[in-house]
């Protein structure tokens, strides 16, 4: 609690939550057949579902806001998964050590280690992407690891889209109707 008695949470802002609750929600939402959906993509035999889900949501949000078009809304899950777990090797760089895992991760394991909304949010908020799929295409884990291991170091900080605002919702409150309705906004 803060000094005025308000309960603070890393998951929601009370002011933002109050504003969202005052908005009317439609009875249902289905983006199929609109310009707000992107195609389903194949994550193959990797554990990169978290990267696919995060970027699919970001693509849809960018379409709704007019930031991307149907032709440009294809962001790289490879880039997100790789840089979440690979630190910069240059010890003189101000970005040295910026990555999500302190554990050693083999090259191919970047695509199988898994992740979640918190990992995606941390990487994207650090301005490490998202980049277009054409910059770091998704392929087999071994092919992607080989390409990314030899990619120019500038690829790490390229970004077509930068995450500036996001909210995390407590997964333990998934049955809470207010939280579920806020997510739909």
Tell where the protein language model's regions lie, with residue ranges.
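N-terminal zymogen propeptides
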Residues: 1-30, 157
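Short, solvent-exposed loop/turn elements at domain surfaces
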Residues: 21, 38-40, 58
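Predominantly the structural core of cysteine protease catalytic domains
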Residues: 24-25, 30, 50-59, 79-185
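A short glycine/serine-rich beta->alpha loop
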Residues: 35-46, 107-110
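Alpha-helical support elements that line or immediately flank enzyme active sites
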Residues: 43-68
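Residue-level detector of alpha-helical recognition elements and their boundaries
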Residues: 64, 69-70, 95, 139
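A Lys/Arg-rich helix-loop hairpin that forms a DNA/phosphate-binding surface
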Residues: 68-81
């Amino acid at each position: 609690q803060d000094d005025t008695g308000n309960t603070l949470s890393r998951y929601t802002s009370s002011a933002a939550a109050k504003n969202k609750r005052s908005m009317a929600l439609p009875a249902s939402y289905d983006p199929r057949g609109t310009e707000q959906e992107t195609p389903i993509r194949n994550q193959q035999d990797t554990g990169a579902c978290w990267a696919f889900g995060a970027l699919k949501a970001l693509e849809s949000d960018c379409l709704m806001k007019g930031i991307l078009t149907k032709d440009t809304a294809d962001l790289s899950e490879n880039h997100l998964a790789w840089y979440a777990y690979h630190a910069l090797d240059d010890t003189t760089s101000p970005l040295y050590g910026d990555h999500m895992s302190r554990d050693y991760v083999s090259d191919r394991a970047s695509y199988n280690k898994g992740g979640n909304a918190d990992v995606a949010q941390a990487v994207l908020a650090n301005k490490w992407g998202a980049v277009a799929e054409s910059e770091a295409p998704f392929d087999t884990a071994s092919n992607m690891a080989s390409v990314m291991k030899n990619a120019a170091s500038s690829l790490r900080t390229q970004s077509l889209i930068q995450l500036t605002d996001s909210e995390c919702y407590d997964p333990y409150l998934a049955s809470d109707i207010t939280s579920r309705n806020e997510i739909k906004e």
